């Protein structure tokens, strides 16, 4: 429990502020451009998993989004294509979540490095985060994997398949 307010800064300066009416509008054309041009490039460049950081990003494009929201947990799985000045583009998958400021235990559990932006909806304010830092999302992934779940999104689907384990292992 903490009474101190979280600093509104990322590693490279103040967090980007996004104002829109609701979760779905956060992913309209105007806000997608903000994500592609400002928020995602800054976030990707700060991550160890992001390829060769010396390459110059020419552009980023969100080519697909899957809504993985469940109950009160708002999640979009973004498929991001990154174009560089040289070489072929690379594809990345980034699940993002919105956590309202009223969920203190969840917001405090997200490290500063996992926050992409501050978000202000008509009814609430909070943060847009990398879902890997959100425990309920991780639990949902593991449960879906264990259950062999398939999520359908119109013509697309996301299938969770368990891998093979060694014969002497007994995991339930």
Report the location of each language-model feature.
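Regulatory N- and C-terminal appendages and interdomain linkers associated
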Residues: 1-172
